[in-house]
């Protein structure tokens, strides 16, 4: 009785040997190692695919690509920028009368000055066969609908002078919301048209903004001082002390403290207000060399970009 062996009957499923285990036992050690490595490789590929498709703040949601279109004007080297300030509605006075413009209250009487800026750009264009004239300015005015400053300036320029040869060397940059973007985005637009970056830049704007363009925006894009020029045209009779003080308070000081308009409340607010139709440029795609500069917003907002640029 004491020598009788105790037998425990296990459930049927517990006594079965998995077919996969039998398969594994019949394999040679070398085959097992190969299968394990292959399975590990598959898992790594799956993990990499999942990780690469996840959303990361530092990753771009686009890929730089080449433009498909007309042949680039590779013989052009001189960028002429006419910075937009308002939207021209059209009319028989060629912009000389304020009624042809959508103006802010403080711009009263300046319509003819904007027309002079356009004429100056055309004069510079006609004097240099290697130049490209870019009218810069976005869809900044609610009252104008989705019509850009740049397109209206271009239309005015064609009404003033529709010469075919000159028309082929003028274009628009339709996303700028402030004077820094007038410069930087026009450089990007120049590249889109020519497949190269400018060797020389000339900006046409108000003369009282000279310091802003020459000493702040030029420095912000690291363009050589001796290759950057400015043509200033103010209203007849000059500008008031109040205008100069407004320039100092609303532009010189803010852009000195924050050259790229990343965090200064006044500059940030202006950009938001000047984009009522929520437009976004494509220069991050078409101008990959400019991505670091276009996205530059340092922790110290007064710090200038010191990376490598194609000029």
From Swiss-Prot:
One of its GO terms (molecular function) is catalytic activity. It comes from the Eukaryota. It is a multi-pass membrane protein. The keyword Transmembrane helix applies. One of its GO terms (cellular component) is cytoplasm. The chain crosses the membrane at residues 34-54, 76-96. Keywords: Membrane, Transmembrane, Transmembrane helix. The keyword Transmembrane helix applies. It is found in: Membrane. Its main location: membrane. To yeast YOR238w. PANTHER family: TRANSMEMBRANE PROTEIN. This is Uncharacterized protein C57A10.07. It comes from Schizosaccharomyces pombe (strain 972 / ATCC 24843) (Fission yeast). The lineage of its organism: Eukaryota, Fungi, Dikarya, Ascomycota, Taphrinomycotina.
């Amino acid at each position: 009785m004491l020598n009788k062996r105790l037998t425990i009957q296990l459930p049927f499923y517990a006594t079965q040997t998995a077919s996969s285990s039998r398969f594994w036992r019949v394999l040679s050690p070398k085959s097992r190692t190969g299968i394990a490595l292959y399975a590990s490789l598959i898992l790594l590929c799956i993990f990499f695919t999942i990780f690469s498709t996840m959303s990361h703040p530092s990753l771009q949601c686009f890929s730089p690509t080449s433009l498909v279109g007309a042949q680039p004007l590779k013989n052009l080297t001189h960028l002429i920028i006419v910075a937009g300030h308002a939207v021209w509605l059209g009319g028989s006075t060629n912009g000389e009368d304020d009624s042809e413009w959508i103006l802010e209250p403080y711009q009263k009487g300046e319509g003819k000055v904007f027309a002079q800026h356009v004429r100056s750009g055309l004069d510079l264009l006609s004097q240099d066969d290697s130049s490209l004239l870019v009218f810069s300015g976005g869809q900044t005015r609610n009252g104008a609908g989705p019509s850009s400053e740049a397109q209206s300036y271009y239309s005015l320029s064609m009404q003033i002078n529709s010469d075919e040869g000159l028309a082929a060397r003028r274009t628009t940059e339709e996303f700028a919301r402030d004077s820094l973007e007038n410069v930087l985005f026009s450089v990007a637009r120049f590249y889109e048209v020519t497949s190269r970056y400018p060797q020389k830049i000339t900006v046409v704007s108000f003369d009282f903004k000279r310091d802003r363009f020459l000493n702040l925006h030029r420095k912000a894009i690291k363009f050589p001082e001796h290759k950057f020029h400015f043509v200033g045209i103010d209203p007849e009779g000059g500008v008031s002390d109040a205008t100069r003080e407004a320039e100092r308070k609303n532009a010189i000081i803010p852009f000195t403290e924050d050259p790229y308009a990343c965090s200064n409340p006044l500059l940030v607010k202006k950009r938001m207000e000047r984009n009522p139709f929520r437009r976004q440029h494509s220069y991050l795609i078409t101008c990959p060399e400019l991505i670091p500069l276009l996205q530059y917003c340092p922790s110290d907002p007064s710090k200038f970009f010191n990376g490598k640029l194609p000029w």
